[in-house]
Regions:
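N-terminal cap/leader regions of alpha/beta-hydrolase-fold enzymes
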Residues: 1-269
Length: 269
């Protein structure tokens, strides 16, 4: 898995928290319906006074929706953004809440990018209806980071950008060779939206040569992108319990919030 069940997202740097929103807003658990009729659960954190930038659709790691991502959605509210975290496994595990013993991998291996993108579309529509948002980005972690990258290949989703934290680029690095497992490096030439990608420099699952090849493909296709690797940081460094990586996490928050501002201004280079 990416994070332990008791992991917590790092706090947003204090100077990026909007004082009037510092108390945040509790996320609401909703059930949405995907295009194929699947019911799936999301956690919606609605900002009472948004800054006007894109709404954030959060794509979790291999465990699907759990407390880390609910908390993360609530964090975005304090910076002025609506955020909604989705669960992937409505088709195979139902919409009930799950405990820490949930055996997620059989469900991961049955989850296709097409299904995830259908759920993203439903999440986008729910955000538009509930909040009035008109622009959207995906933000994913690990498995969700790879799904976020691939969402950037689908112009029908109407995304303004995609963001990935240590999204695995070549799943064979982890011995995952399923044709349905997301492999952004093989699809990089099809990405059409701006990309922000953040990696741990000590992550054996995403070696420098994969990152370089991914960036080269984006550059070749003229896709605006920002890619950064944190020296010495592991996979899943974005965790409040990793004191030794607190600076990397704070910098990652700043890069994400700066990127959202650029997306709003149409200024991603």
């Amino acid at each position: 898995m990416c994070f332990t069940p008791d992991a917590l997202p790092p706090r947003i740097p204090e100077d990026r928290v909007i004082p009037a929103l510092a108390g945040g807003a509790a996320a609401e658990r909703l059930t949405l319906e995907s295009a194929d009729g699947t019911s799936f659960v999301v956690a919606l954190a609605e900002c009472p006074d948004p800054v006007g930038g894109p709404a954030v659709i959060i794509l979790p790691d291999v465990r699907g929706l759990y407390s880390f991502y609910v908390d993360l959605a609530e964090r975005f509210v304090t910076a002025g953004y609506h955020a909604l975290a989705i669960d992937y496994f409505g088709r195979t595990a139902g919409a009930e809440e799950r405990d820490d013993e949930f055996d997620y991998m059989p469900h991961v291996m049955q989850t296709t990018p097409a299904q995830v993108q259908a759920d993203i579309a439903a999440a986008r529509d729910a955000l538009a209806e509930r909040t009035g948002a008109t622009s959207f980005v995906t933000l994913g972690f690990c498995f969700g980071g790879a799904q976020s990258d691939l969402a950037g290949t689908n112009p029908d989703l109407g995304l303004d950008a995609v963001i990935a934290f240590y999204g695995m680029l070549s799943p064979e690095r982890a011995g995952l060779d399923s044709p349905d497992f997301p492999a952004p490096l093989r699809s990089a030439d099809k990405i059409v939206t701006p990309v922000l990608a953040l990696y741990g420099g000590a992550d054996p699952l995403i070696p420098p040569e994969d990152i370089q090849a991914f960036e080269a493909a984006l550059t070749s296709n003229g896709v605006p992108h920002e890619i950064y690797s944190y020296p010495g940081a592991p996979h899943s460094f974005f965790d409040r319990s990793f004191d030794e990586h607190a600076d990397a996490s704070a910098d990652a928050w700043r890069r994400v919030l700066d990127f959202l501002g650029k997306v709003e201004a149409g200024a991603v280079a």
